[in-house]
A protein has these predicted regions:
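Substrate-binding/catalytic cleft of secreted carbohydrate-active enzymes
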Residues: 1-185
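Proline/serine/threonine-rich low-complexity linkers at boundaries of modular beta-sandwich domains
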Residues: 189, 193-208
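Beta-strand-rich binding/interaction modules
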Residues: 221-263
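Intrinsically disordered, low-complexity coil segments
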Residues: 174-184, 191-195, 251-256
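Generic beta-strand/beta-sheet core signal
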Residues: 93, 169-172, 203, 231, ...
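Generic structural signal for residues positioned in beta-strands
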Residues: 91-92, 208-210, 244
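Intrinsically disordered/low-complexity terminal segments and short unstructured peptides
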Residues: 41, 195, 259-260
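Short beta-strand segments of immunoglobulin-like
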Residues: 213-218
Length: 263
């Protein structure tokens, strides 16, 4: 990594080959991120990675492939100190490398000079495989999965106290060169129907309540251990003190308060 003196912050995706502070990567930018490779959880964060506590060294001389424009480029690895620690705020770049399935109903929305040729290509490929009649099922399944991945990725960033912020790859689909259907909104800034603005702000807002646990699924005999965190990027400072909580379900109604342990 190179820190430029006039920069106010460091924006990137890794501090060495294995010190990754983004949750997902294209194969040309391997190794892949924790959301692609690890067991689903809400405990992972980037703090040790940014502080250099689990750093590794590149010996130099080897070559790797990296994303370059819409293709790949082979570059030579230089020697890098795995203990490198940034001296400026760290921003995670292009978070959200999740490709939604194309919505073919969107084709009729192109009424001007721009023609969605990429949708024609995708349709032709599905027709060749005899799968076009199932595209709506694929769209719904992939969309639900991608939206959950977005949630996991953003919550990981918010759990990381050493990470100062993140830049989304895009909130909407990009239908220009290469085509990236990575948005929860389509190219016309319209919802794809997988999440409401209110639910999105539940994990992407100035103040977000987070539950930190090692896994999503617990056995009947297991006792879950959950740490509750509050991520606050708002203008005002959150005062420490007693925090009131309420847990409700069809069979549960628990209310109480607990003293906060850190600010």
């Amino acid at each position: 990594p190179a820190e430029i003196p006039q920069e106010d912050f460091f924006a990137g995706v890794r501090l060495s080959r294995d010190r990754l502070f983004r949750g997902s990567y294209a194969m040309c930018d391997a190794p892949l991120g924790h959301i692609q490779t690890d067991k689903p959880n809400t405990a992972y964060d980037y703090d040790a990675i940014i502080r250099g506590e689990n750093g590794s060294e590149n010996e130099g001389g080897d070559t790797i492939q990296i994303q370059y424009g819409t293709g790949v480029k082979t570059v030579k690895l230089s020697a890098a100190d795995g203990s490198y620690i940034p001296h400026k705020p760290v921003i995670s770049h292009e978070v959200g490398q999740y490709d939604y399935f194309p919505d073919f109903d969107e084709m009729k929305m192109y009424t001007g000079p721009l023609v969605p040729r990429y949708l024609d290509i995708f349709r032709e490929r599905l027709e060749e495989k005899g799968l076009y009649t199932q595209w709506r099922d694929f769209f719904e399944a992939v969309g639900a999965h991608c939206t959950q991945c977005y949630k996991d990725e953003i919550e990981t960033a918010l759990r990381s106290s050493e990470l100062s912020g993140f830049q989304l790859l895009d909130l909407q689909d990009f239908n220009g060169q290469g085509v990236s259907l990575v948005g929860v909104l389509n190219a016309f800034m319209q919802s794809k129907g997988f999440i409401t603005p209110e639910d999105w702000r539940g994990f992407c807002d100035s103040n977000v309540l987070l539950a930190k646990t090692e896994k999503y699924v617990f056995g009947a005999e297991e006792k879950p251990s959950v740490e509750i965190l509050l991520s606050s990027y708002g203008k005002g400072k959150i005062k420490s003190g007693a925090v009131q909580y309420s847990l409700r379900s069809d069979e549960l109604d628990i209310n109480g308060s607990v003293e906060s342990t850190r600010s």
